[in-house]
């Protein structure tokens, strides 16, 4: 179209009346030139592809012939497989446990009938003894063998057989259900042990020595009074055996018995009796001067060596003491008399 700008009106009219000029002008346009170029490129590409296809023609023909041959072989193998399968079914049907069981039962019945017929002939005298023994023993042996086989086959037939499951017929196994995730539990706080409550000690509502009779109630404050002096072995050092001391406290000195002055503070809940400067202890052997911890004569003892308050009967069992009129009731079960120094299991003194 760029060349039409320079032409005059007369030239344009002449070109309009000339079809060759119009065709030449159309062929010289850039759009037509691009189309022609694309056409030539497509033709060249098709030509190269055709040449490549021609190169593959030989191997393709050879492969086609090989495929035809393999297909013919496959058809022959299929026919042969069908024949072998038919033979296998024929043989397997004859070897089924049920079929074999029927055949063995029939053969067993036949051999049994033959053996019975042989026995009848022998009884009638038609068969000699030697022939009868040989044939009859072999027939009966075969009969028993077949009976055993029949019984075994019957067990096999009755027993359920676990047939192998085909992989295609078995449905896929379901995955196991997901297990619930245990929730995290908060750590349990350790329980603190209960604090011991402080209880005010109070006197016991019962007598510490239930085996002794209860005396009259004292009125007013009790005055201290000594215990009577009785004989005691000089080698006595305290109760024997694995029994704990009545009151926890520091151990007494060697050679002295227990006394309230050397013991610890009284335990709460147990009533204690007022003591003098020298607490009650075990009496000394006659003639020995009392030391610390042994009973001494009180300066406040009234006339007649009698305490000003009612007393209870003394504990029986110590040598040298008068027996009370009340029958003794020991704090331990009656039985063999314990040795000297035996520590009773219960409280012996009503005031300790």
Swiss-Prot record:
It comes from Mus musculus (Mouse). The modification Phosphoserine is found at residue 29. Disulfide bonds: none annotated. Residues 162-352 are annotated as: Disordered. Residues 78-167 form the VPS37 C-terminal domain. GO terms for cellular component: cilium; ESCRT I complex; Golgi apparatus; late endosome membrane; nucleoplasm. Residues 173-185, 202-213, 319-336 have a biased composition (Pro residues). It is a peripheral membrane protein. This is Vacuolar protein sorting-associated protein 37C. Component of the ESCRT-I complex (endosomal sorting complex required for transport I) which consists of TSG101, VPS28, a VPS37 protein (VPS37A to -D) and MVB12A or MVB12B in a 1:1:1:1 stoichiometry. Interacts with TSG101, VPS28, MVB12A and MVB12B. Component of the ESCRT-I complex (endosomal sorting complex required for transport I) which consists of TSG101, VPS28, a VPS37 protein (VPS37A to -D) and UBAP1 in a 1:1:1:1 stoichiometry. Interacts with HGS and STAM2. Interacts with CEP55. Pfam families: Mod_r (PF07200). GO terms for biological process: catabolic process; protein transport. Belongs to the VPS37 family.
């Amino acid at each position: 179209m760029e060349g039409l700008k320079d032409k005059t009106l007369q030239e344009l009219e002449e070109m309009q009346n000339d079809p060759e000029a119009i065709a030449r002008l159309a062929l010289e346009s850039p759009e037509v030139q691009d189309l022609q170029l694309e056409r030539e490129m497509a033709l060249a590409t098709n030509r190269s592809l055709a040449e490549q296809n021609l190169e593959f023609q030989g191997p393709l023909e050879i492969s086609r012939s090989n495929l035809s041959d393999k297909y013919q072989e496959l058809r022959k193998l299929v026919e042969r497989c069908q024949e072998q399968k038919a033979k296998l079914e024929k043989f397997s049907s004859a070897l089924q446990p049920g079929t074999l069981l029927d055949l063995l039962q029939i053969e067993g019945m036949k051999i049994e009938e033959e053996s019975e017929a042989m026995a009848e002939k022998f009884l009638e005298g038609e068969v000699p003894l030697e022939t009868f023994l040989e044939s009859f023993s072999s027939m009966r042996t075969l009969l028993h063998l077949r009976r055993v086989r029949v019984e075994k086959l019957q067990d096999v037939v009755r027993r359920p057989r676990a047939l192998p499951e085909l992989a295609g017929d078995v449905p896929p196994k379901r995955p196991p259900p997901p297990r619930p995730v245990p929730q995290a539990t908060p750590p349990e706080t350790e329980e603190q042990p209960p604090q011991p409550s402080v209880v005010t000690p109070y006197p016991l509502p019962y007598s510490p020595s239930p085996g002794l009779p209860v005396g009259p109630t004292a009125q007013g404050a009790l005055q201290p009074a000594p215990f009577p002096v009785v004989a005691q072995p000089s080698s006595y050092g305290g109760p024997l055996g694995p029994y704990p001391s009545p009151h926890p406290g520091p151990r007494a000195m060697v050679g002295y018995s227990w006394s309230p002055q050397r013991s610890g503070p009284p335990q709460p809940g147990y009533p204690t009796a007022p003591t003098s400067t020298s607490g009650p202890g075990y009496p000394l052997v006659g003639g020995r001067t009392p030391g610390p911890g042994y009973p001494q004569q009180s300066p406040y003892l009234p006339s007649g060596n009698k305490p000003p308050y009612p007393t209870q009967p003394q504990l029986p069992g110590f040598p040298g003491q008068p027996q009370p009129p009340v029958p003794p009731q020991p704090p331990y079960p009656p039985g063999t008399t314990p040795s000297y120094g035996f520590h009773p299991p219960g409280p012996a003194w009503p005031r300790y």
